[in-house]
Each structure stands twice: as structure tokens, then as C-alpha cells.
């Protein structure tokens, strides 16, 4: 909730963890149980280098930025990529709904998540309107850098772990 200056900002910050807690978390916990794993098992694993670099980039953007514009630019690529990727998957292969991962796909391709993405994008537009040219450029750079890390995150998911 770093650098939040208004209640509106706090509400927007809380909306993403709210989705995770209410929807994605339930689905993820179901998968863990199904595969005989626990949340503690996952938490004990070291972050992969791609994840560590991404997390560090996001934290640095929030810590070193002037306020909410930098924070949201660091978070938005993650949120938008999930919605876009899972919606494309569903559009191309509707039968994915009937697979093991159908519930996960539906979490991110559903109307509730699409609404949340639109709300976050609108909020980003609002907090980035009127920024100085220098700060706007920094925000674009943060969005770009985090988008590149998001791409590496998705690429990483196709590579088996070699560090365990």
C-alpha cells in the first residue's frame, strides 16, 4: 500500500489481492490439494531467477517512484497479461473449460477479471494523466520493464526447474 495518498488509491491497491484471495487462491489451493502439495511446500521453494528479477523490479519501482503512478505501472503488466492470455486461450480452444485447468482459465477469462482489468487500466489512465514529461517517461519505462519481466515469467513456466 506504499505511497497511497487517498482512500481511492488504497481501494484500488486492495482490489488485486481481493481477486487473488476470492478466486484464484481458491482454485490454486484446490490444485495443490489435488497434487498432494501444500501452500507451505510452495512457499519453501526459492524464487527462480526470472521471478526474483521481476519481484525486484516491481519493488524498486514502488520504492523509488514518486507515488501511485509508478506502483500501478509496475503491477499492470501482470494483471493485463493474465486476462489477455487466458481469454485468447479460451477463444482459440473453448474445450479447455473441460480440462484439468479449466477452472484456472475461467478465473482469468471470466467477466469479473475482465472488469477488474478495465478498472485498473482506467485507474492507471487517471493517475498518469497530467504527469510531467519526465515522470511519464519513467512510468512508461516501468511498464515496459515489467512487461519484459512478465514475458520472461511466461517463458519460465515452460522450463522445468533445475535448481531443486
Regions found by a protein language model. Name each.
Residues 11-115, 148:
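Active-site-proximal alpha-helical scaffolds that flank and shape metal-associated catalytic sites
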Residues 138-164:
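Acidic, carboxylate-rich catalytic segments that either coordinate divalent cations
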Residues 1-5:
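N-terminal domain-start signal
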Residues 110-144:
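Long amphipathic all-alpha helical oligomerization modules
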Residues 31-32, 83, 124, 128, ...:
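Hydrophobic residues within well-ordered, non-membrane alpha-helices that form the packing/core
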Residues 6-10:
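Transmembrane-helix boundary and interhelical linker motifs in polytopic inner-membrane proteins
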Amino acid at each position: 500500500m506504499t505511497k497511497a495518498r487517498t482512500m481511492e488509491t488504497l481501494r484500488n491497491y486492495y482490489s488485486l489481492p481481493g481477486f487473488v484471495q476470492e478466486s484464484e487462491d481458491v482454485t490454486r489451493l484446490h490444485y495443490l490439494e489435488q497434487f498432494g502439495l501444500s501452500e507451505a511446500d510452495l512457499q519453501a521453494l526459492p524464487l527462480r531467477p526470472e521471478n526474483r528479477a521481476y519481484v525486484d523490479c516491481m519493488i524498486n519501482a514502488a520504492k523509488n517512484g514518486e507515488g501511485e503512478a509508478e506502483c500501478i505501472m509496475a503491477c499492470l503488466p501482470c494483471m493485463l497479461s493474465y486476462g489477455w492470455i487466458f481469454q485468447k486461450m479460451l477463444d482459440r480452444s473453448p474445450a479447455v473449460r473441460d480440462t484439468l485447468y479449466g477452472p484456472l482459465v475461467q478465473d482469468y477469462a471470466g467477466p469479473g477479471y475482465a472488469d477488474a482489468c478495465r478498472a485498473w487500466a482506467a485507474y492507471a489512465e487517471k493517475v498518469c494523466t497530467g504527469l510531467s514529461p519526465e515522470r511519464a517517461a519513467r512510468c512508461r519505462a516501468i511498464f515496459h520493464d515489467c512487461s519484459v519481466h512478465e514475458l520472461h515469467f511466461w517463458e519460465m513456466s515452460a522450463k522445468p526447474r533445475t535448481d531443486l
